[in-house]
Amino acid sequence: MAVLYPAVKAIGEGLGDKLFYLTAKTITRTVAEQAFSILEEKGLAFRSITLTAKEKICFCEETECNPDACPYAKGHFDRVNDAVYDMLEKQKKLTRESIERQAEDFHVCPFELSLDLSEWADGVICDYNYVFDPTAHLKRFFADNVSGDYLFLI
């Protein structure tokens, strides 16, 4: 909390666009979610999301992301905007469980839904590999032609 509060305050003061809380283990992710919850209970207006690895959040036996192999990929882009809008209207805290429910309700890929939702979040809780591993990084935030003033908690 001693590190999170000043980072959230900096975002509120316009000193950054988005906060990335980087974790290595599930317990650290849980602690980050709890810290955001405590601040939200005290009145913080801040949308946070927890990103879960594709292999862990995928509904299919095999993680094969193409419309021929995955029923959630087929027509995904026809439905995902409604799923994103609906979820953003209803929730501030976007967790694995809530993303899975929304993905099931709208029959969309839960991993891709979480990535789309992350663009609307003030804070992103994720594995540090999404930032530091070039094969896993979040291209929508860290590609060469993308810019943003991001704060990182490691």
Provide a role label for each language-model segment.
Residues 8-12:
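Short glycine/serine- and small hydrophobic-enriched flexible loop segments
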Residues 130, 146-154:
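SF2 helicase catalytic motif II
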Residues 137-147:
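Short, conserved "post-DEAD/DEAH" coupling segment immediately C-terminal to helicase motif II
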Residues 15-124, 128-132:
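A substrate-engagement module of RecA-like helicase motors
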